[in-house]
UniProtKB/Swiss-Prot annotation:
Keywords assigned: Cytoplasm, GTP-binding, Initiation factor, Nucleotide-binding, Protein biosynthesis
Composition bias type Polar residues, residue spans: 116-151, 181-195, 254-264
Binding, GTP: 627-634, 677-681, 731-734
A cellular component term, taken from the record's GO annotations: cytosol
Family membership: Belongs to the TRAFAC class translation factor GTPase superfamily. Classic translation factor GTPase family. IF-2 subfamily.
Paired cysteines (S-S): none
Residue ranges, annotated region (Disordered): 63-519
Source taxonomy: Bacteria, Bacillati, Cyanobacteriota, Cyanophyceae, Synechococcales
Region feature G3, mapped onto this chain: 677-680
InterPro entries per the UniProt record, alphabetical: EF-G-like_DII, IF2_II, IF2_N, P-loop_NTPase, Small_GTP-bd, T_Tr_GTP-bd_dom, TF_IF2_bacterial-like, TIF_IF2
Protein name per UniProt: Translation initiation factor IF-2
Pro residues bias: start-end ranges: 161-171
Region (G1): 627-634
Bias kind Basic and acidic residues: ranges: 70-83, 429-443
Amino acid sequence: MTISDKIRIYELSRDLNLENKDILDAAQKLSISVKSHSSSISSEEAKKIKNLINKKNPDKTILSINKPSIKKDNFKQNKEDKSPVLSSKQGKPLKNNSNKKPLLIKPLNKPESVKKISNQLQNPNKPNIVNSSQSRANLTNTNSKPSQNFNQDKKTFVNNTPPPIKSPAKPPIQLIAKPKNINNNVKSSESSQNIARAEDKRRLSSKPDQNTNKPKTKNFNNRKNTPELVGAPIRREDPIINPNKQNNNKQNIAFKQTASNRPGSPNRPGMPNRPGLRNKPSDQGRPGSFNRQGNPNRPGSPNRPGMPNRPGLRNKPSDQGRPGSFNRQGNPNRPGSPNGPGMPNNRPGSKFNGQNSSGIRKPVSPNELLQLQKNNNSEKDKIGIKNNSKQNIEVPKQKAKAPNNRPNATPSSKKPPHRTFSNSSKKPGKTDWDDSAKLEALRSKNTQKQRQKVHIIGENDDSLTSETSGYSGEKISILSASLARPKKGKSDESKSQKTIKQFKKKKKETTRQRQKRRAMELKAAKEAKQVRPEMIIVPEDNLTVQELADKLSLESSEIIKSLFFKGITATVTQSLDLATIETVAEEFGVPVLQDDIQEAAEKTVDMIESEDIDNLIRRPPVITVMGHVDHGKTSLLDSIRESRIASGEAGGITQHIGAYQVEFEHESQKKKLTFLDTPGHEAFTAMRARGTKVTDVAVLVVAADDGCRPQTLEAISHARAAKVPIVVAINKIDKEGASPERVKQELSEKDLIAEDWGGDTVMVPVSAIKKQNIDKLLEMILLVSDVEDLQANPDRFAKGTVIEAHLDKAKGPVATLLVQNGTLKSGDVLAAGSVLGKIRAMVDEHGNRIKEAGPSFPVEALGFSEVPTAGDEFEVYPDEKTARAIVGERATDARATKLAQQMASRRVSLSSLSTQANDGELKELNLILKADVQGSVEAILGSLEQLPKNEVQVRVLLSAPGEITETDIDLAAASGSVIVGFNTSLASGAKRAADANDVDIREYEVIYKLLEDIQLAMEGLLEPDLVEESLGQAEVRATFSVGKGAIAGCYIQTGKLQRNCSLRVIRSEKVIFEGNLDSLKRVKDDVKEVNTGFECGVGCDKFSSWVEGDVIEAFKFVTKKRTLSQ
């Protein structure tokens, strides 16, 4: 009882010495809301429950409402109600039962539980009971002889015990309590059959006398108080022969004993107890039940002969004469199953069953029998008493023919007893022992179709399993009929298991396994197509090794092997040139065809389309000025601009962009010319790499006093790659020592032959400073452009090229655009390469804002999403959706192109080095070499060639004998080169120019020193290596679990440990983990480092499997200067 006047169900049951279910049943009848034995109720509700239980059980002699025990009042009412019915309807005296001799079987050992219960009995006159068989025999004798008392019955049992049962061949008796000696339960079938025959004769010749007198009831009640009396009730009417001979399994068992074996007797010859099952009491003396004379299936007694024990199930009492059921002795029909031949409907809910089902009680387990058996006159029992009059008439008919079938009913003799489902004694949905009896009925109907063995471990199953492995395992698969469901097929289970296994297997597939599987699939696919192609087409004159292998239907390893034998080391991603591809393909017998593609320098998109033909007009030419740095290119451009701009604007000219437009009067007509300042400008190089054709005419400026220089030759190659006409301007003709003819001679060696020499190249001698022949040069440019027939359509969406682009802090991405066709207007949506833009503003070369720009007009435009790439082509689209789609496709192509460039052949050339160096993908050292004599230059160049060039390339821009001049300074400043002088001097003004342009000049007199410094400079361009430096070593001496991880308690043996350093865990001389030291603590404080001789805690986020004895090696990575590798 709690402080708050609340009491729990289990406390109340303990106070009343009842079970929890008794209290719960009483609470349900009183409509008190309780859920389980731990529910709390008020003290008033507890009083109501006590009053209800006291009314039902004034003497409190019954333990449980649902327990099958013998009750005083009920037995009295049975005799009062049933005696007239039996005597009137049967017309046979009940005293004939006195002729039967009782059968007494002495138990081997008296269980201690009986002793304990006997001390608690309410009847003090009978404290010592020899065994349960005596009590039951006494009870039987009392029913048959009303004039005798209990002591006389006891003596009669002892004296009248038949000798066949006392024979040593008979099995020991099993008491109500849990059996101790299991092995003695085995019986012989012959002895049980002899007993059955003897019993049959006695039973058929005698008619049981029903008790009608009160004294008999008193004697019975006195005997009832013993715990052994909890058993099947005794039939109190004469058995009537039942024509149904097939369903008498229980009756056969009953007639194997003499009439002296009465209910309550534990002696059951030839019948072992079921292991793991509780012996259920029989219904002897219950209201509404008959006295089953001669039925050996009693609570606590050995079960039927020849019937193995059932593991996991309690022994059920026999159901003969129970209310709601016939005397089903050996009847295989079970509730809920089809009835046997000649049997009425036994199913729950049937008419007959409904009439006789109210007096059934649940069986009692051995543990429950150890407590006091208390009277409980429940409503269920009262209902059973009222229905007994009808039961007494029909039930005996089931007993008559039992003895004839018992010896031969071997299969049916193994059928366990069953009970009819009782609606009044058990609530629907509750699992009871009756449910398992229903299953027994279902299985016994078709014995050949038995369920699979399922051994259910019971309370008493520990030592009985070996004795009862036969019947129980074969017959029982589940305990409750309410839980019975068809078993899932093995095939379905196996399929589902396989599916789960496959699914888990896929989940556990590692990256390496997946790669291996894909490689195997690819190999199988390639093996399936081993047919060589007739020919392969090589686009863009290059293919990677993998692409070539795919085209030849070979493995990439075959291509690499072929290249290796040719002295070429390649990888699957390395690009191969056309010559190498042809060599490899011919080895495998496949010809190579070059794809009909325009050369790289030509434009990939034609600016003039077929729709523009009707609206074409002449457009101004685009002129590119190229040449060496010191050959007067800038002076020439300045002269052209100054001569064609009004004198009022001359002083305020500021070139904002790399392209500008000038007007020139030719043949009384004003002509516009667009000049592109490309020499030294990165835009021209980017456009050549992109393969675009921007310029219409290339002007090559060559100094008359210096002749052709390396950059002059490079400019010639640029113009030829772009396939544009070249106009040569021989500058500085006014300077002393100028020789235009020598320049023509040098150019003729490069296949540029002047017109006056019979060639087709226009060469004009000019002087930018003196402004000589400037007009003639412009006229030649116009003549050449007229021959080219340059046209465009201004009435269409604009197309053009990005000259240059940069990111402005205030304006954002800014691009210089050259319109080549159409008209560009503000608000147009355009795609420049892989960049989307919408024109927000445009300005010309003078900084004036304009709204539109026609063909060959350079403008500076704003409104791009990001900075476009110089050399990309742009095009205006009608809507943003279309432009965005085009941009996405170009972005994909751009990535592929960049990848191809990265995987290009590693053969080093001047142009490829320049391109990669500009992109920051290659370390490059630019040099300008000047020496005293040509022999020194050649020697130095030969030594530089021997330096390692795998990681850093040496590019000598200029190597010549002579002194270091200002021209060399200018070249070094433009290219970011270092000037190296060997036994030479500086020209006048060179030192000043070098300081002004911040150019590094190195002078040497010994070649070895020169080579050493150059090698050190090359190594300085290399990124330093990360080298492992050891910090210390610690040993794990303890581990601590913290949350999901673990902390290692360590002792620093050498060096020190630092937080966030790298560590390596070594166990059994093997490295099991390598990562970072994330947590370092000294006692409870976070520390940065712990030195030798101290203890600390080490934690790693990605490792927690610490084991005592692990060794932790701490280290860190430091940078180390790299050296050149061969």
